[in-house]
Amino acid sequence: MSALAGLVDKGLMAPDWAQALAPVDEQIAAMGRFLREELAAGRTYQPTGEWVFRAFQRPLADVRVLIVGQDPYPNPEHPIGLSFAVRGDVWPLPPSLVNIYTELRDDLGLMPPRHGDLTAWADQGVMLLNRSLTVRPGASNSHRGKGWEPITACAIEALVRRGGPLVAILWGSDARNLRPMLGQIPVVESPHPSPLSAYRGFFGSRPFSRANRLLVEQGGRAVDWALPME
């Protein structure tokens, strides 16, 4: 059984994503070996198990907005396989997510919740994709360049081939470097929401209302960015 077929069989990846990622099936298998070797060497990784490919559990056909992150939070037990999101019981929230919530309030007047679980966005077709899908706890960027990038690039290329209605939200230089890959897909871009750069143009960039406007212009439905309070 191929790596992708195994993921679909376990309910960890939508079938249309498995079809789109067929060109990197061997690379996905190689990443599985890499992660097993990490564990054998006493080096854990996160997120684990069913959350590694969580961004691919909703169908490719349903994706309306792509938000690209760098890699999962390195804080132990924080990441849930969706970029910028954390487990619902994590407190305090990561500073980048606090700034995202501040911009959400300023942009759309929506009161942010106390939790950092962004599953409600994913359920509406917002793909929260990290360029690297795993990280060693406590070591940011530790799995960068280990082999995830060709896989996530293939995913982005699949979205571009599928076409709109689709909007890409690119925060920070790493994400913005992907713009040439996106072709004619409308893009909303700004500095990263990190405290190091949020005041250099993330605050006031209104990404949520701008993305909705671009979706509607393509004949799509606007995203309801409100998150459940609990």
From Swiss-Prot:
<dbReference type="Pfam" id="PF03167">
    <property type="entry name" value="UDG"/>
</dbReference>
<comment type="function">
    <text>Excises uracil residues from the DNA which can arise as a result of misincorporation of dUMP residues by DNA polymerase or due to deamination of cytosine.</text>
</comment>
<keyword id="KW-0378">Hydrolase</keyword>
<keyword id="KW-0227">DNA damage</keyword>
<dbReference type="InterPro" id="IPR005122">
    <property type="entry name" value="Uracil-DNA_glycosylase-like"/>
</dbReference>
<dbReference type="GO" id="GO:0005737">
    <property type="term" value="C:cytoplasm"/>
</dbReference>
<feature type="active site" description="Proton acceptor">
    <location>
        <position position="71"/>
    </location>
</feature>
<comment type="similarity">
    <text>Belongs to the uracil-DNA glycosylase (UDG) superfamily. UNG family.</text>
</comment>
<dbReference type="GO" id="GO:0097510">
    <property type="term" value="P:base-excision repair, AP site formation via deaminated base removal"/>
</dbReference>
<dbReference type="InterPro" id="IPR036895">
    <property type="entry name" value="Uracil-DNA_glycosylase-like_sf"/>
</dbReference>
<protein>
    <recommendedName>
        <fullName>Uracil-DNA glycosylase</fullName>
        <ecNumber>3.2.2.27</ecNumber>
    </recommendedName>
</protein>
<dbReference type="InterPro" id="IPR002043">
    <property type="entry name" value="UDG_fam1"/>
</dbReference>
<dbReference type="GO" id="GO:0004844">
    <property type="term" value="F:uracil DNA N-glycosylase activity"/>
</dbReference>
<keyword id="KW-0234">DNA repair</keyword>
<dbReference type="InterPro" id="IPR018085">
    <property type="entry name" value="Ura-DNA_Glyclase_AS"/>
</dbReference>
<keyword id="KW-0963">Cytoplasm</keyword>
